[in-house]
Amino acid sequence: MASQQIDWAEDLVTEVVGERLKAATRKRGAEPLSHAIEAKKLRESWEALRVWLRAKLLAKRGASIPGFGRFTWQVLGDYRPSDLQDRPEELIPLRPVFQFSEDFCKAHLLPWRPISEDKLVECADLNYSILALRHTSRLTKDMVWSALRDLQRKIGDRIASGYSLTLDFGVGQLVAERGKPRFCFDASKLRREEEQVVPQ
């Protein structure tokens, strides 16, 4: 059965907004939430994450999203990750790598296995304050943190439930079918013209 073209990010946003509105109506004395404002927070946080992630990978650095996973580079051949700084003029062959975090896999009953670290570029942890300040118009650190936490949880729920999912991360797509996720990097979004990226 062919899957329809669905904007999965928008679908996840709609679900999370619905959950937030239900939770707010259950609380006594809580101010009512606006569907449009909650959706805007989630969309803007998601787009900020995509922009940050792409910037890190274009700079040949790894990016770690706490509680979700990491996106990094594997250095190929006889090179080492330190060669990226030591020999910046040299074209060093790289392969993009994605790995879910062990916590994410445990929470959603997904298999997890470690990856050999010796050829991987070190990852920078996502800083929610910097993400909010640099990549959003008015969101606070707490707004971005809670938005991404809720979206990550919903992604995990979808994968664990066996739903088909294709979600654009700005550097490629997270694809899940029948509870089996994989990440498909888009080489055109990961390189500048003078660089060489080896496909997965």
Task: State what each model feature region is.
Residues 1-200:
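Strongly charged
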